[in-house]
Swiss-Prot record:
Residue ranges of the region described as Disordered: 497-521
This protein's name: Transcription factor GLABRA 3
Signals that turn on the gene: By nitrogen deficiency and UV light. Negatively regulated by MYB66/WER, GL3 and BHLH2 in the developing non-hair cells, and positively regulated by CPC and TRY in the developing hair cells.
Gene knockout outcome: Plants exhibit two-branched trichomes instead of three-branched trichomes.
Function: Transcription activator, when associated with MYB75/PAP1, MYB90/PAP2 or TT2. Involved in epidermal cell fate specification. Negatively regulates stomata formation, but, in association with TTG1 and MYB0/GL1, promotes trichome formation, branching and endoreplication. Also regulates trichome cell wall maturation. Together with MYB66/WER, promotes the formation of non-hair cells in root epidermis cells in the N position. Whereas together with CPC, promotes the formation of hair cells in root epidermis cells in the H position by inhibiting non-hair cell formation.
Chief subcellular location: nucleus
Pfam families (UniProt xref): bHLH-MYC_N (PF14215), bHLH-TF_ACT-like_plant (PF22754), HLH (PF00010)
GO molecular function, one term: DNA-binding transcription factor activity
Tissue specificity as recorded in UniProt: Mostly expressed in roots and flowers. Also present in stems and leaves, and, to a lower extent, in hypocotyls. Expressed in epidermal root hair cells (trichoblasts) and moves to root hairless cells (atrichoblasts) by a cell-to-cell movement through plasmodesmata (at protein level).
Residue stretches making up the bHLH domain: 437-486
Length: 637
């Protein structure tokens, strides 16, 4: 930033022109980077206007400030704050110096804690300087072409060295373009796509101001530009001298479009080499003024033809055959001259690490502290005067509590030191051998569980006969179908058993009431038609005679079947008739039973039969099936 004697060289109305331009386009800030009067070939802060968010408003006037003056007042307050901090930093230790710092600091209406993020960005920008050809303003000044940068907060630091600051302040769009012998930079917190009408609007705002060249252009000599090589001289380009036609230029004001202007322009166009010689030696100041005006007028009326998504450099052409630019030298020659010029000027490094050092030094200046947590290891041995006292651990801090003088400072100190320790402790716990062992145990247990599950599925696949696939879903589906089929078969067998039991009980009841067969009736009638008491029995009453009591109350007592593995034991008692034993044995054979022991006896018209047999073949008859088949044979009359 131009301080002290340098700042007086900036025109007074430049800030007002910046204010009008920035307010017209509604951007956050505007900066004019001018050629340094103390360092050759360097661009530094010339002036600026802040139009962004304001965190705290402080005024030293009793009356209300108008809306259009708020931005100017805020910009002045930020400049005063930076100057006060700079003076405090540069002052040496001592009573006299301390009183000077106190007086200077009291003049500032703002303090660092009153600033918003965007104001911090604007304030820190005051400390930046750029070599010509380096940094965004330096490249713009060297090339004479505007640069439009979108996504400045995420840009590479090699492209935009203040990307870290832009990220903290949410500055997304930054535009630089050459103007008035320096570089105008504008920025906003919104994402604005490339539009050359914005630059045109800013330039038009300067041109529409009341005779800006009367005050701005003559002040160019105050910048000591005569002692510094012009960007066009450094790059080896031809001077951007507009070649006007015989018609007067339509954009120029009437006071400028005179015959003298045409004569001076022709002199510049025809004798360009002599112009450069005069400019280097310090002569022909009026020609320089005309040259600068022609350059700015041509930049105002021409727009860009090329654009890109993020960073673009626009190239202007002649409009309608009225303006034509001189030829440029080759790029190789320009680069060689740049390197030669850089040997004569003080270089500033803009690699990311040096940018961090520069940023930390600015923060150190503002906060007046060199604490290791804030500045990092680069400033460990800094011995700078600070308003903060260095905190040291006392004897009580070893027990976990720090001795503090104020509750707020104690809370802040505890947050700064304890919170990182908590996170570090959690990280160490996650990285500890116990945690790794526990994680490994979980993996082993999960592997074993999956192996057991696979074994169960393979066992189930072997049990279910209809399973042909090996995937788990198919095995489960086939198992469900098989169980449903078994359930249906059980229901069918139970219903069949109930119907068989009902039928058997009905058959036994009928047999008890059934009369003797015809042979027995005939023999009974032939033998004796009288009963034991001498009474004659009617033939019609013979059918009503009760059968002999067998001593069995039901089928459960007449048939017993026992199964012992592959062996079956059948115990049967039924009414004896001719051929009944043979029929029973045939039924047992049909049931795939191999009889190896048969015991039978008859008495009182009953057949008692005990058969020991074994299953033969793959077909196995259940006890229910055996019982049902024997009941159909044994109780048929």
């Amino acid at each position: 930033m131009a301080t002290g004697q340098n700042r007086t060289t900036v025109p007074e109305n430049l800030k007002k022109h910046l204010a009008v331009s920035v307010r017209n386009i509604q951007w956050s800030y505007g900066i004019f980077w001018s050629v340094s009067a103390s360092q050759s070939g360097v661009l530094e802060w010339g002036d600026g206007y802040y139009n962004g968010d304001i965190k705290t408003r402080k005024t030293i006037q009793a009356s209300e400030i108008k809306a259009d003056q708020l931005g100017l007042r805020r910009s002045e307050q930020l400049s005063e704050l930076y100057e006060s901090l700079s003076v405090a930093e540069s002052s040496s230790s001592g009573v006299a110096a301390g009183s000077q710092v106190t007086r200077r600091a009291s003049a500032a209406a703002l303090s660092p804690e009153d600033l918003a993020d965007t104001e911090w960005y604007y304030l820190v920008c005051m400390s930046f300087v750029f070599n010509i050809g380096e940094g965004m303003p330096g490249r713009t000044f060297a090339n004479g072409e505007p640069i439009w940068l979108c996504n400045a907060h995420t840009a590479d630091s090699k492209v935009f060295s203040r990307s870290l600051l832009a990220k903290s302040a949410a500055v997304k769009t930054v535009v630089c373009f050459p103007f008035l012998g320096g570089v105008v930079e504008i920025g906003t917190t919104e994402h604005i796509t490339e539009d050359m009408n914005v630059i045109q609007c800013v330039k038009t705002s300067f041109l529409e101001a009341p005779d800006p060249y009367a005050t701005i252009l003559p002040a160019r000599s105050d910048y000591h530009i005569d002692n510094v090589l012009d960007p066009q001289q450094i790059l080896g380009d031809e001077i951007y001298a507009p070649m006007f036609s015989t018609e007067p230029f339509p954009t120029a004001s009437p006071s400028r479009t005179t015959n003298g202007f045409d004569q001076e322009h022709e002199q510049v166009a025809d004798d360009h080499d002599s112009f450069m010689t005069e400019r280097i030696t310090g002569g022909a100041s009026q020609v320089q003024s005309w040259q600068l005006m022609d350059d700015e007028l041509s930049n105002c009326v021409h727009q860009s033809l090329n654009s890109s998504d993020c960073v673009s450099q626009t190239f202007v052409e002649g409009a309608a055959g009225r303006v034509a630019y001189g030829a440029r030298k080759s790029r190789v020659q320009r680069l060689g001259q740049i390197q030669e010029q850089q040997r004569n000027v003080k270089t500033l490094s803009f690699d990311p690490r040096n940018d961090d050092v520069h940023y930390q030094s600015v923060i150190s200046t503002i906060f007046k502290t060199n604490h290791q947590l804030i500045l990092g290891p680069q400033f460990r041995n800094c011995d700078k005067q600070s308003s903060f006292t260095r905190w040291k651990k006392s004897s009580s801090s070893s027990s976990g509590t720090a001795t503090v003088t104020a509750p707020s400072q104690g809370m802040l100190k505890k947050i700064i030191f304890d919170v990182p320790r908590v996170h570090q402790k959690e990280k160490l716990m996650l990285d500890s051998p116990e945690a790794r062992d526990e994680t490994g145990n979980h993996a082993v247990l999960e592997k074993k569980r999956r192996e057991k599950l696979n074994e169960r599925f393979m066992t189930l696949r072997k049990i279910i006969p209809s399973i042909n696939k090996i995937d788990k879903v198919s095995i489960l589906d086939d198992t469900i179908e098989y169980l449903q089929e078994l359930e249906r078969r059980v229901q069918e067998l139970e219903s069949c058993r109930e119907s068989t039991d009902t039928e058997t009980r009905g058959t036994m009841t009928m047999k008890r009431k059934k009369p003797c067969d015809a042979g027995e009736r005939t023999s009974a009638n032939c033998a004796n038609n009288e009963t034991g008491n001498g009474k004659k029995v009617s033939v019609n009453n013979v059918g009503e005679a009760e059968p002999a009591d067998t001593g069995f109350t039901g089928l459960t007592d007449n048939l017993r079947i026992g199964s012992f593995g592959n062996e079956v034991v059948i115990e049967l008692r039924c009414a004896w008739r001719e051929g009944v034993l043979l029929e029973i044995m045939d039924v047992i054979s049909d049931l795939h039973l191999d009889s190896h022991s048969v015991q039978s006896s008859t008495g009182d018209g009953l057949l008692c039969l005990t058969v020991n047999c074994k299953h033969k073949g793959s077909k196995i008859a259940t006890p229910g099936m055996i019982k049902e088949a024997l009941q159909r044979v044994a109780w048929i009359c």
